[in-house]
Curated annotation (Swiss-Prot):
InterPro entries associated with the record: NADH_UbQ_OxRdtase_su1/FPO, NADH_UbQ_OxRdtase_su1_CS
GO BP terms in the entry: aerobic respiration
Stated name of the protein: NADH-ubiquinone oxidoreductase chain 1
Catalytic activity, reaction form: a ubiquinone + NADH + 5 H(+)(in) = a ubiquinol + NAD(+) + 4 H(+)(out)
Protein family (similarity comment): Belongs to the complex I subunit 1 family.
Native organism: Drosophila affinis (Fruit fly)
Pfam families named among the record's database cross-references: NADHdh (PF00146)
Record flagged with keyword Phosphoprotein: no
Location within or outside the cell: Mitochondrion inner membrane
Catalytic activity, EC: 7.1.1.2
Domain of life: Eukaryota
Amino acid sequence: MEFILSLVGSLLLIICVLVSVAFLTLLERKVLGYIQIRKGPNKVGLMGIPQPFCDAIKLFTKEQTYPLLSNYLSYYISPIFSLFLSLFVWMCMPFFVKLYSFNLGGLFFLCCMSLGVYTVMVAGWSSNSNYALLGGLRAVAQTISYEVSLALIGFKILLFSLL
């Protein structure tokens, strides 16, 4: 019974995160529209509120294309794996209802964030294009350098909170 409750809680958390990201994207588009002295997305429904759902339907109905010489399976699995890794990060966040209790939640956060680097590298490699591979390696180098500074800042905060 406890497993089912944690599974339902996890699914509810994932759905809430995805819907909130969709509406934050709508907010960003509205703000950018008002900055550029236009209304932003307002054609769908009342003031464009259902726009993220229409964008999702449009995205899922588009034709799937892939490079001819690419590794088909890893080309499509790496972005899906990256999405799952970013959703796993939300599992260690402390909420009012404890879904999972981690003693080392910060370490789990850093591990999930550092595993996302490999998905970018695999996505660049699996297209079998030298330019995509170089772009993926450049993104990996940038991400690793940002992760080092993020870890140092986190350890500094942890050190000062213990003093």
